[in-house]
Design a protein with these regions (language model features):
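Phosphate/pyrophosphate- and phosphate-bearing ligand-binding catalytic cores of soluble enzymes
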Residues: 4, 10-17, 54, 152-299, ...
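Beta-rich strand-turn-strand
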Residues: 107, 306-309
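Anion-binding (especially nucleotide phosphate/pyrophosphate-binding) glycine-rich loop
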Residues: 1-149
Length: 335
């Protein structure tokens, strides 16, 4: 395994912002990972996957680890029924290629998460979700290395502390995910859960798992920019949770506010709606703007400086705060 000094990270974040890593390496096994941790015990560490949910505003003064640990295997569990299928997938496998693998074999549970960029290892960190599904619903176990002790530890689903775009791995930043064990089903029945997807499938009486994947891909491609053409990180902000009273105040002026009741009396609303009504749909300042088809996505039209993105982000946050008294929280990681 080689180490690189002052390594350019532009190709390791989907916003394509420039930054140098003091040290960079790509371990291909857990043994190589242990070696790089042992070789640089006192360096600050950052583990990155596909770089689809982060960007850089400055150089990283430490060790950047971009693992290349791949592999997939089916595992058996005598206590489970024949309906169940378990797959252990290593962290560096491409997420959408894995979803395609499952759909081709009729393994149900991931089809709504089609075309999400990134790696398998990033999925539980962010608890990725789309079209009424979250990855936490199909994760049985996460195998990780504790970066402080170099020990391999396993987390059952309930130990991962999954939340909305959140997990113990995201909050603590002290674990390197080695693999994820998924619990899927061998049979599939479509359950309507999301308006756009339901509408896309309305002419199909009994959608197959492949029909659902194809529909998700079509909807995403219409709404979302290709990061290879227009650098972006997908949804930039989390959808906010507000009180019922707060929602009612907004609805008095904006009757079409999306409002989804949640446990504890809160209401989940749409960050895209708020950004749109605050005047930032399709808005561009210099080389940074929101995507015209989806204001939740910030796109980079040509800046190499991550601070340009931060300034634009802060403008949106202030506009939404002024109009709705809601503070938008970034979904992406900013370094």
């Amino acid at each position: 395994m080689d180490y690189y000094r002052q390594y350019q990270l532009k190709n390791y974040n989907s916003f394509k912002t420039e930054a140098l890593a003091k040290i960079f390496c790509q371990p291909k096994s857990t043994d190589e990972l242990r070696k790089c941790l042992a070789d640089y015990p006192n360096e600050k560490k950052l583990i990155i996957g596909g770089g689809c949910n982060l960007f850089f505003t400055k150089d990283f003064d430490g060790l950047v680890i971009c693992p290349d640990i791949k592999g997939l295997r089916e595992i058996s569990d005598e206590e489970e029924e024949d309906e169940d299928i378990f797959l252990e997938v290593n962290a560096s496998e491409n997420w959408d290629e894995f979803v395609d693998y499952c759909v081709e074999r009729g393994f149900a549970g991931l089809e709504n998460l089609s075309l999400i960029p990134g790696t398998v290892g990033a999925a539980p960190i962010q608890n990725i979700g789309a079209y009424g599904a979250e990855v936490k619903d199909v994760i049985r176990e996460v195998v990780a290395m504790d970066l402080e002790t170099n020990e391999v530890v396993s987390f059952a689903n309930n130990e991962c502390e999954f939340g909305y775009r959140d997990s113990i791995f995201k909050r603590t930043c002290k674990y390197f995910i080695i693999s994820v064990i998924f619990h899927l089903k061998r049979t599939f029945v479509y359950t309507p859960r999301y308006f756009d997807l339901n509408k896309e499938l309305e002419d199909i009486e009994e959608p197959s798992i492949q029909d659902v994947r194809n529909a998700v891909i079509r909807v995403r491609q219409r709404k979302l920019p290709d990061e290879k053409v227009l650098p972006n990180t997908g949804s930039f902000f989390k959808n906010p949770y507000i009180t019922r009273d707060h929602a009612d105040l907004i609805i008095a002026e904006y009757p079409d506010l999306p409002a989804y009741p949640q446990k504890g009396g809160l209401v989940k609303t749409s960050a895209a709606f708020l950004i749109d009504k605050a005047g930032y749909k399709g808005k561009r300042i210099g080389n940074i703007g929101t995507y015209p088809n989806q204001p939740l996505i910030i796109v980079n039209y040509g800046s190499a400086n991550g601070k340009d993105i931060v300034r634009f982000m802060q403008e949106i946050q202030q506009a939404v705060k002024d109009e709705f008294n809601i503070e938008l929280e970034p979904e992406v990681r900013i370094y």
